[in-house]
Swiss-Prot record:
Self-association and partners: Homodimer which binds Holliday junction (HJ) DNA. The HJ becomes 2-fold symmetrical on binding to RuvC with unstacked arms; it has a different conformation from HJ DNA in complex with RuvA. In the full resolvosome a probable DNA-RuvA(4)-RuvB(12)-RuvC(2) complex forms which resolves the HJ.
GO cellular component: cytoplasm; Holliday junction resolvase complex
InterPro entries reported for this sequence: RNaseH-like_sf, RNaseH_sf, X-over_junc_endoDNase_Mg_BS, X-over_junc_endoDNase_RuvC
Cofactor note: Binds 2 Mg(2+) ion per subunit.
Protein name per the record: Crossover junction endodeoxyribonuclease RuvC
Organism for this UniProt entry: Cutibacterium acnes (strain DSM 16379 / KPA171202)
Classification lineage: Bacteria, Bacillati, Actinomycetota, Actinomycetes, Propionibacteriales
UniProt entry keywords in alphabetical sequence: Cytoplasm, DNA damage, DNA recombination, DNA repair, DNA-binding, Endonuclease, Hydrolase, Magnesium, Metal-binding, Nuclease
Subcellular location: Cytoplasm
Amino acid sequence: MSIPKSTPDRRVTRVMGVDPGLTRCGVGVVEGGLGSSLKLIAVGVIRTPADLDHAHRLLRIHDGLEEWRDHTRPDAIAVEKVFAQHNRNTVAGTAQAAGIAMMIAARHGLPVALHTPSEVKAAISGSGRADKAQVGFMVARVLRLSAPPKPADAADAVALAICHLWRGGAARRIEAAVATQRRGRRVPRSWKDLAR
């Protein structure tokens, strides 16, 4: 897999979304900022063969995520929050892949955020119960793509990055309003006032 090298525009925030998995770990990098449209930087999947021993599969995920981080230089990493599933082996591998993504963020001093699947679905489609096809459709629509990224793990990673950009941006604006109020200044009455 070839990951395009790119230099982020400092007026926008670049987020690397990670849909963790042991067999397929989706990765999507999106950038956007206040008043600018979202832009897909790169999308793909890190694959590990099932016949490889577990430790070496995790090492491949680590090396792949490091390569993605090196090439795309994100400002933050958003990871899907892992929930217990019926298959304990699946959830263990998924949680380990998520931990690797968080460790890489920490190693490079990047903020890391965990988003639940319902949060991501609600942010991207308006419904926390959207299915994978609906999420993929909305990812393509928001980014003006001719088709959703494939496979679904890649589309989910892009949706995570979009969710973080949208939700993280709102959180930063709220923090700015609170900080302004603490300094004794007038609190903006609308989000547009915060952009000034």
